[in-house]
A protein has these predicted regions:
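Short, conserved micro-motifs composed of acidic
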Residues: 66, 263-264, 327, 342-377
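Basic, alpha-helical interaction scaffolds
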Residues: 298, 371-438
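Active-site palm subdomain of RNA-directed nucleic acid polymerases
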Residues: 165-180, 204-207, 283-313
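Conserved pre-catalytic core of RNA-dependent polymerases
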Residues: 42, 68-276
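Short, conserved secondary-structure transition motifs
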Residues: 6-12, 188, 254-258, 351-360
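Catalytic palm subdomain of template-directed nucleic-acid polymerases
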Residues: 100, 219-238, 310-333, 391
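Catalytic palm active-site di-aspartate
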Residues: 90, 129-132, 149, 179, ...
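Basic/polar low-complexity segments
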Residues: 1-73
Length: 438
């Protein structure tokens, strides 16, 4: 989540001389006030009774009998080595590069620290603190607070601990068949292959062939709205060791964050919901949180990647496919309500994939909580723009347009003295043209 070029405190995260209006109609003028309002926006995503929730978590884990477990020097070293280098620092003013310079003796001390925190369940407060940097969203009004997204920076030592624990958690969670996120030998590519294969298989049926309806569901700020007590209850039902259950429960409750904006720093506030922003363990915890998503009924499928959920149905008559899909959408909505996730029908989309040109302009009649889901012809799912006939023309054209624009930048660089260096051009190509095609 971090990007050094974006998150250096010395570099501006927006124009310093503009007033910013926030959702509470508060217009922030000073840098200090902007930092304060940003922190409220990023930390207080959902309002819950934090103290009551924390007491529930304590009660849930208090009776657990923990079996001792030891983290080894090799596990600590491998966790550090396999972390991508970042220059941005956490709230402890450390980054992963600092840890990569540790020698054997220092690694031993660090491992002892991790083991002490795990065995005693005493977690340093700095491990539960997030430093948040507001980053302007592209092509958005910089005068609105909602036009900024948070980059959350954590202690690299805390993230090392998270990384050490991940294998112990994932190996004890039953994998969900249709979940492609954060799963061995699965990725966005396998998710997209599963979805597009369903569509093309339908097209290849004997006439009149199968149409496929795909709904792309929008979960608003899904990672940030997770109910922590509900998450711990789901963790309790797994085969994860009690020692790790107790540690994770303590680690994710009572977390705090502060925001830095243009050199101004807000006060710390407590996160009331959500898995740790910027944490490497968070995707695994979210996968656990959504593991009890209702299974699709017969004639309906679903493909998920983290919080991207795409239920679908195929049939020679699109109206029958639509009727098959509607009850499942209602089941998913009820599940999101129970789990306190926010399903937004207005930002969700429904698309009819059909081999028949006459049906390209069909408006579907699917709803979530009695709200019509917008019908779109070219949805963007997991970075891939699809079209009703699955020709990928829209995706290819948009990718080519973006690549052409970046190639012009390369040509301009090649005309400068310093830009003629081969390595400079290759690095720029990978960062612009190649990355835009992945």
């Amino acid at each position: 989540m971090e990007n050094y070029q974006q998150t250096q405190e010395q570099k501006p995260s927006g124009s310093p001389n503009i007033n910013i209006k926030f959702d509470n109609n508060k217009e922030a003028i000073t840098q200090q006030d902007k930092a304060k309002q940003f922190n409220k926006q990023f930390v207080n995503v959902v309002k819950h009774a934090t103290k009551k929730s924390n007491r529930k978590i304590d009660k849930t884990t208090k009776a657990l009998t923990a079996t001792p477990m030891k983290i080894t020097n090799i596990q600590t070293y491998e966790a550090i080595k396999n972390t991508i280098n970042k220059d941005s620092t956490g709230p402890d003013n450390l980054n992963i590069r600092h840890l990569k310079h540790l020698g054997p003796i220092a690694i031993q001390y660090l491992t002892d620290t991790l083991n002490l925190a795990l065995s005693t369940n005493c977690i340093p407060q700095i491990w539960k603190l997030a430093k948040i940097i507001p980053i302007p969203k592209p092509n958005k009004d910089p005068n609105l607070g909602t036009s900024y997204r948070p980059i959350s920076l954590l202690s690299p030592i805390a993230k090392t601990m998270e990384k050490v624990l991940i294998p112990h958690i994932t190996s004890n969670i039953t994998p969900v068949r249709y979940q492609h996120g954060f799963k061995t030998q699965h990725s966005t590519s396998t998710a997209l292959h599963h979805l597009t294969n369903q569509i093309t298989t339908g097209f290849n049926q004997k006439q009149p062939a199968d149409r496929t309806i795909v709904v792309s569901l929008d979960l608003s700020k899904a990672f940030d709205t997770v109910n922590i007590h509900n998450l711990i209850q789901k963790l309790q039902q797994t085969n994860v060791t009690n020692l790790i259950k107790k540690f994770v429960a303590n680690y994710i409750k009572g977390r705090k964050g502060y925001t830095l904006y243009q050199g101004a720093q807000s006060k710390q506030q407590q996160f009331k919901t959500g898995v740790p922003q910027g944490g490497v363990l968070s995707p695994t915890l979210f996968k656990l949180y959504t593991s009890d998503l209702p299974a699709p009924p017969q004639n309906v499928s679903i493909t998920t990647y983290a919080d991207d959920m795409n239920p679908s149905a195929s049939h020679a008559n699109y109206r029958i496919a639509q009727n098959n899909l509607q009850p499942y959408l209602e089941d998913i909505f009820k599940w999101t309500q129970k789990n306190e996730l926010i399903l937004n029908p207005d930002k969700s989309t429904a698309t009819l994939f059909t081999p028949h040109q006459a049906e390209f302009n069909t408006i579907l009649d699917l709803t979530i909580n009695n709200t019509i889901i917008p019908t779109v012809k070219t949805p963007k799912i997991l970075g891939l723009t699809l079209d009703p006939h699955l020709t990928f023309k829209d995706h290819v054209n948009k990718t080519k347009e973006k690549a052409d624009k970046n190639i012009k930048i390369l040509k301009a660089l090649n005309g400068t003295t310093w830009g003629k260096q081969k390595q400079t051009l290759i690095a720029t190509y990978k960062a612009t043209v190649q990355s835009g095609q992945s």
